[in-house]
Design a protein with these regions (language model features):
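Membrane-interfacial helix-loop-helix
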Residues: 2-33, 60-155, 180-194, 202-227
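Transmembrane alpha-helix interface/packing and boundary motifs in multi-pass membrane proteins
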Residues: 34-56, 199
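A generic structural signal for solvent-exposed, polar alpha-helical segments
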Residues: 36, 97, 162-165, 173
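Residues that scaffold the ATP/ADP-binding catalytic core of kinase and kinase-like folds
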Residues: 57, 92, 169
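Hydrophobic alpha-helical transmembrane bundles that constitute the permease/transmembrane domains
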Residues: 137-141, 161, 165-168
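Transmembrane alpha-helical segments of integral membrane proteins
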Residues: 168-179
Length: 228
């Protein structure tokens, strides 16, 4: 519970915490953010990391009146690489570990997350890798599911690169350009909440649909295991 409260505080006051990180670590901030984005996209057990709000807030901070010593273009390049590499690692983990890591009683790797991502992947195919970048939870699990489904690596990489570049550019540069507009700057906490709510709505809707139309997810996993 305490960890959840700390995470919520970090998200709601992410601009303050990022400023503290920059003041303390300066250019090491590049590495810190690289590791956060890499972890969120690279490990199926870390879907809770606040990627969207982090990117927007970082862009706004670099554009602010306080000197950070950071370059928006270097940050952009580093985080694009982190996002692409993270998804690639996640894909490889999925191809090796398979669907059996998802359990009904697992608080992080829930069966319903696998089920929702599997449906999303089946519906949109390769585009799911690109579209899921903008959907919390899905962006962490979609490349893992692609690995389980043995999606051709070349096709996966194509959508992975497009999605990674688009996601990082949209939110980081969006924060850089919009973060200093007075109405946004003066209500930054509300903007962060808005970003979090908007990006989580599709995941919440998918969860509701999953409850309204329950399916035997175990059969899906057994089918994946049989094919492997």
């Amino acid at each position: 519970m305490e960890l959840l409260q700390q995470l919520l505080d970090f998200i709601l006051h992410i601009d303050v915490h990022l400023a503290e990180i920059v003041n303390e670590y300066r250019t090491w901030t590049y590495l810190i953010l690289f590791l956060i984005i890499f972890a969120e996209t690279g490990f199926v057990v870390t879907p809770f990391l606040p990627g969207d709000s982090l990117l927007f807030a970082m862009g706004a901070l670099i554009a602010g009146e306080h000197e950070t010593g950071l370059s928006i273009w270097i940050m952009l390049l580093i985080l694009i690489v982190a996002a692409i590499l993270g998804n690639t690692v996640n894909y490889k983990l999925g191809s090796v570990l398979g669907a059996g890591v998802f359990k009904e009683n697992n608080k992080i790797l829930k069966l319903k997350y696998y089920h929702q991502s599997h449906e999303f992947f089946e519906k949109h195919g390769g585009k799911a890798i690109m579209l899921s970048r903008f959907l919390p939870i899905f962006r962490t699990i979609a490349p893992f599911v692609a690995g389980i489904a043995k999606m051709p690596f070349g096709r996966f990489t194509y959508y992975n690169i497009i999605g990674g570049v688009t996601w990082i550019f949209a939110l980081l540069i969006g924060g850089y350009l919009l973060g200093q507009i007075p109405v946004i700057k003066n209500n930054f906490e509300l903007v962060i909440i808005f970003i979090a709510v908007v990006t989580f709505v599709p995941a919440i809707w998918a969860a509701i649909k999953s409850r309204l139309k329950p399916k035997k997810i175990e059969e899906i996993i057994e089918g994946e295991d049989t094919r492997s």
